[in-house]
Amino acid sequence: MSHNSQVEDNLALSTCCCSHKFEDGYAMLEWMANLGFKKVELSHGISINLVAGIIQAVEDGVIGVSSVHNFCPLPFGMNSPMPNIFQPTSRSQREISLWKRYTEETIKFSQRIRSKKVVLHSGSAWFFFKSPLYKLMNWLEKNDIKESELKDNQDFIKVRDKLMLRVERASRRRYKILKESLQSIEAFARNHSVQLGVENREGFTELPLDADHSEFIKSFDLDSPISYWHDTGHAEIKALYGLLDHEQRLEDMKSHTIGYHLHDVSDSGDDHQEIGTGVIDFSMISRFIDKDTHALVLELSPKLSEDAIKRSKDNILNYLN
């Protein structure tokens, strides 16, 4: 097998672009295979009624599964993506117990369909009163400024920094709870031979905060299944806001990264766009990708056409090869 074909065989498509269209999991995976993919990521919109067909399709060799996104399958009675419905940072012990239960269900499902990687969201800061985020959103609505100009706008920086100061204060106690929650599933993940990738998020109040993400992941033991999952779109959005340096994040986390969500960001800040149509420097990102060990997942908007999905596949392969 040539190197190029090996990279193509390992490139996965996330079901986030199509799971809402199907009532049969087998038909869904056949549709994705017919687009030219050998692997998929099962995202957080997989309802229970899709599971039997998915398992059968995997057993029949229709397609492979590179990764699974928590919670998958969805908790019983839920039919739309709800990756944050139970948070590992909650003030409610009952909610944390539900997070643990359904995360373990995801880990078991991942092993069942021969996937060794699970993507996790990891909660958020908590505010007794209204989240201060609304002040920043109001400022953005009132000021007609391009996303690419925000990080250099002094008025925006003042509003942003005031917000982040409050978020940082509100997150302090959440980190202890988050670490305990993740530690509570370490042994379970290890026993199922599954790695857990804590994803970088686009939300201002979601944890780990960008300033803390690297240090937080590195606080786990070297043999821990807790690792890092890099989302290119989320990182670029945070870079547009001046909250991180995209390249530096990749450098800091290169020895802890287990996978990538690959999608572009438009100049207006919309993510999950067709690769090559936005502002992300995929040539830079490709330097950090280990094509042999990293899970590589196209995570595209359900609004994109089949042709846009195929172009994204071709474009990212051009960068990777």
Name these PLM-found stretches.
Residues 10, 32, 36, 77, ...:
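A generic structural signal for ordered alpha-helices
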Residues 1-17, 22-33, 48, 100-120, ...:
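Histidine-acidic metal/acid-base catalytic patches
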